[in-house]
Amino acid sequence: MHIDFDGRVAVVTGGANGIGLATARRLGESGARVALWDRMAAAGAAAADTLTREGLEVLFVETDVTQAESVARAVEATVARFGGIDILINNAGITRDAQLVKVKDGAVTGGMPADDFAAVMAVNLTGVFTCTQAVVPHLLARGGGRIINATSVVARNGNFGQTNYVATKAGVIGMTQVWARELGKRGITVNAIAPGFIATEMTAKMPAPVLAQMADRTPAGRLGAPEDVANAYCFLASPQAAFINGAVLGVDGGLVIGT
């Protein structure tokens, strides 16, 4: 299946590396002009430079998705450069893992800091809301568009030590379904992808036995690659996915059924 994004403008949050960078590359290779939004200035500029040298049309905008003013500036810069926005991929996300409480000898000895809970909520959930609310008027101005949000397989079954992360990813599914109802008749589809274990810079720091265990838990027998997730994002952003709305697409190698 050939996917053509010629004439389309896509925004990818968290686009400086990993899944976001792979997605930006795939969109650009298929004809889209791409805006990378990321708060990591050096990494984002380097990513945009790399993609530009590959012949793609890319803009990097230093953006903090937790700050409405920063997002508004990113929207303004993107529209000024490319003339509009057709696709929003809410990919930015962080983790701050800890148990709700730590118990030793029957006594609570610690737990998840409130600041860590709030930080993950701000990026992974509120950031999705802020970016989407800022971009939707521009999708409407183009007669419609695509919004794809990042959730996770853990939104379904939970994950030890990830109260904050799981809460955000479950919330993203809820927002996705609400927005699919609210925007569908206006030509905007809203979907989500739910990655499983993906080989990124973060997982590369894990011990080899842990990575092997993660692969073994996945029925496909391997970790996913950033390109696997990028392909899913691009499909849901494509004209071929016009009648898919409110869906959550698993990109997990069968992890959900294997656990």
Predicted regions and their residues:
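C-terminal helical subdomain
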Residues: 129, 192, 215-240, 244, ...
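Short C-terminal tail/terminal secondary-structure segment
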Residues: 1-4, 157, 233-234, 245-259
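Short, small/polar-rich loop/turn modules that mediate ligand/substrate recognition or access, typified
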Residues: 184, 189, 244-246
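Alpha-helical segment proximal to the catalytic Tyr-Lys
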Residues: 137, 180-182, 242
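Active-site helix of classical SDR
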Residues: 132, 168, 176
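Residue(s) in the substrate-gating loop at a strand-loop-helix junction
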Residues: 152
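Substrate-binding pocket helix/loop in short-chain dehydrogenase/reductase
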Residues: 99-118, 214
